[in-house]
Design a protein with these regions (language model features):
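Intrinsic disorder/low-complexity signal
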Residues: 7, 32-33, 96
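N-terminal cap/lid segment of alpha/beta-hydrolase-fold proteins
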Residues: 8-29
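Residues at structural and domain junctions
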Residues: 9, 36, 84-87
């Protein structure tokens, strides 16, 4: 789903992830993917909600030649499991998930 203020013509070309996987965090199993340049400047995309997840169009927001884009489905959202769960789903835990993902991917 596109933002009402962003026209498709203004986005970067579509790209496929060069890496995707899952990260186990207590009872949550988080889905993530990386796209763009493996040696590019890291950038993290956080999707909206509630319940929404990442979409292929989100990969188009960043220049794939300059950025290593990390996208992930937050707790209870998208391809993360359990879907729609609010158990152990707080802002503090989200911040912990982001830090764990950063370390898992070896990003300084």
């Amino acid at each position: 789903m596109m933002n009402a203020f962003i026209q498709e013509r203004d986005l970067f070309p579509a790209s496929l992830p060069f890496h995707s996987g899952r990260l186990q965090r207590d009872l949550h199993d988080l889905y993530f993917e990386e796209c763009g340049s493996q040696t590019g400047r890291p950038v993290l995309f956080l999707h909206g909600g509630p319940g929404a997840g990442i979409a292929p169009s989100h990969r188009r927001f960043f220049n794939p030649d300059r950025f290593r884009c990390v996208l992930f489905d937050q707790r209870g959202c998208g391809q993360s499991r359990p879907f729609a769960s609010i158990e152990s789903n707080t802002t503090d835990l989200l911040i912990g998930d982001i830090e764990a993902l950063r370390q898992h991917l070896g990003i300084d």
